[in-house]
Amino acid sequence: MAMNYLEAFPKELREYYKNLFGKEEANKIMKKLREPVEHYYIRVNTLKISREKLIGELKKEGLKPLRSPYLPEGLYFVREGPNFSDDFEPKLPVVVANKYAAESVYQGAMLYAPGVLKADKNIKEGDEVQIRDPKGLLVGIGIARMDYKEMTEATRGLAVEVTLPKFKLPSLSELKAFEKGYFYPQGLPSMVTARVLEPKEDDVIIDMAAAPGGKTTHIAQLLENKGEIIAIDKSKNRLRKMEENIKRLGVKNVKLVQMDARKLPDLGIKADKILLDAPCTALGVRPKLWEERTLKHIEATARYQRAFIWAAIKSLRRGGVLVYSTCTLSYEENEGNVKFMIRKGMKLEEQSIFIGSPGIGMNKVQRFYPHKHLTQGFFIAKLRKVKDI
């Protein structure tokens, strides 16, 4: 029997959420975290195509894109599902997928052999099977395309063709429109983040944790490929992936720098605008079949973030702007660190687009909640440097 949605969160995290949001809200948030986003967003790459033209292209592929009411470059698709209830018990042989593969199947992806942990020994190619995560949650039903032995031993190939996932999001990366760089799959709050930065072409702009490039390429698009954005990431592989995205999207005004962003002041640049999408506990990411992080992860990560924040503040000119964002729900990584910034000579500013909720005991910052905004859990703050410390 699979655990219910509350059991998917460590007890101390459940208590933490209850204290932070109140019991009723906390339960609603945790329930939604277990599901994929209801509205799956993509950003129209207006460097290459208009929103209306892309809608036409996608409709030709049998898709049903809808216009975002908030952003002229936003389109979204409505999630399908749930296709079966939590207590549905099909009488079928079982394939167990690892957490990552199970989360993908749960949203409509196929199951490939590397994602198979174990399987019933009587499974033959062509059999109908059920797919469960390692903790017993039913994520989908499909047809075995390998027998038991092959799917548990092979390092590549399709193990199960998924015919009935729990939920279904559109599969977009195979589309011609994707290859041509007409769009980038990106959540609504992430798009709002780049808009809140309000980039101008004569600004010195730094994106401090840039790869794989969603927000950087959005800023480039808002600048119509003018000016320059310095994009920093310490991972060579992630920067390689970012380079592919930049090329696909036709972005021309980004300079990639491989370095630890905590050492940003060593470059001696005084920026007008800095975007810091900080490394975080990712407590707001959906779907989460189960959560493993606890309070000690929250506390350690909030401390770790301060090294990036301090580097950003030192690298801003006086009067410069920092937009700070996370995909997490904790107070310490969000409002707690905004208080740290204020102590270090920063002042909170109004955001040009505000479609989330106010912060916890703090106005001008915006929070996105899974149960209220049908998005990931997300946080955005905009601050201006008013004094040097």
Curated annotation (Swiss-Prot):
Temperature section of the record: Methyltransferase activity is much more higher at 65 degrees Celsius than at 55 and 37 degrees Celsius.
Catalytic reaction equation(s): cytidine(72) in tRNA + S-adenosyl-L-methionine = 5-methylcytidine(72) in tRNA + S-adenosyl-L-homocysteine + H(+); cytidine(72) in tRNA(Thr) + S-adenosyl-L-methionine = 5-methylcytidine(72) in tRNA(Thr) + S-adenosyl-L-homocysteine + H(+); cytidine(72) in tRNA(Cys) + S-adenosyl-L-methionine = 5-methylcytidine(72) in tRNA(Cys) + S-adenosyl-L-homocysteine + H(+)
Binding annotation for S-adenosyl-L-methionine: 209-215, 233, 238, 260, 277, 304
EC number: 2.1.1.-
All residue ranges annotated as the PUA domain in the record: 92-167
SMART domains in UniProt: PUA
Active-site annotation: 327 (nucleophile)
GO molecular function annotations of the record: tRNA (cytidine-5-)-methyltransferase activity; tRNA binding
Keyword terms of this UniProt record: Methyltransferase, RNA-binding, S-adenosyl-L-methionine, Transferase
Highest taxon above the source species: Archaea
One GO BP annotation of this record: tRNA modification
NCBIfam families linked to this entry: nop2p (TIGR00446), unchar_dom_2 (TIGR00451)
Record HAMAP family: NSUN6 (MF_02237)
Function: S-adenosyl-L-methionine-dependent methyltransferase that specifically methylates the C5 position of cytosine 72 in several tRNAs. This modification appears to slightly promote the thermal stability of P.horikoshii tRNAs, but does not affect their amino acid accepting activity. Four elements in the acceptor stems of tRNAs are essential for substrate recognition by this enzyme: the target site C72, the 3'-CCA terminus, U73 or G73, and the second base pair C2:G71.
Membership in a protein family: Belongs to the class I-like SAM-binding methyltransferase superfamily. RsmB/NOP family.
PANTHER family, alphabetized: NOP2 YEAST -RELATED NOL1/NOP2/FMU SUN DOMAIN-CONTAINING, TRNA (CYTOSINE(72)-C(5))-METHYLTRANSFERASE NSUN6
Protein name: tRNA (cytosine(72)-C(5))-methyltransferase
